[in-house]
Amino acid sequence: MSKRFLPAVLLLLSLGAHAATEGSVTLHGKRFSTEFAVDDASRELGLMNRTQLAADHSMLFVFVDDQPRAFWMKNTLIPLDILYFDKDRKLVSMQLNAQPCKADPCAIYPSDGNARYVLELKAGTAGKLGLKLGESLTVEGEPGTVR
């Protein structure tokens, strides 16, 4: 391989290492295509700078441990429902209709308890589904190595 192509190949490989993998989740009988965010880079990027999120799409943030979580909407351009799930994938907290934030200071949306999984959906989805605390989240697909 030519040395002049090596930097481009390395860049592409590094971007792929931080890309969110895809699968699906089911919540209250509704299935959503999902992107898994399992490392610091993909969790930090989240749904930033996206101009839309389909009604049947989501992002699932996966962490290695249970602890109180807090999300913010910095550079997120669309309102979201933020749902927090414990290690058993039971819904423990909801922050509904979290609004976009383009400049500091941005509001913080904390969980009300320990969470290992955080699901972001298009704002209004949780209400339409009639979600209640204790709901179970089913995950299909391999999220990859959680770091």
Regions found by a protein language model. Give the residues of each.
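Bacterial N-terminal signal peptides that target proteins for export
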Residues: 1-6
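N-terminal signal peptide c-region/cleavage motif recognized by signal peptidases
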Residues: 14-17
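General helical structural elements
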Residues: 7-8, 47
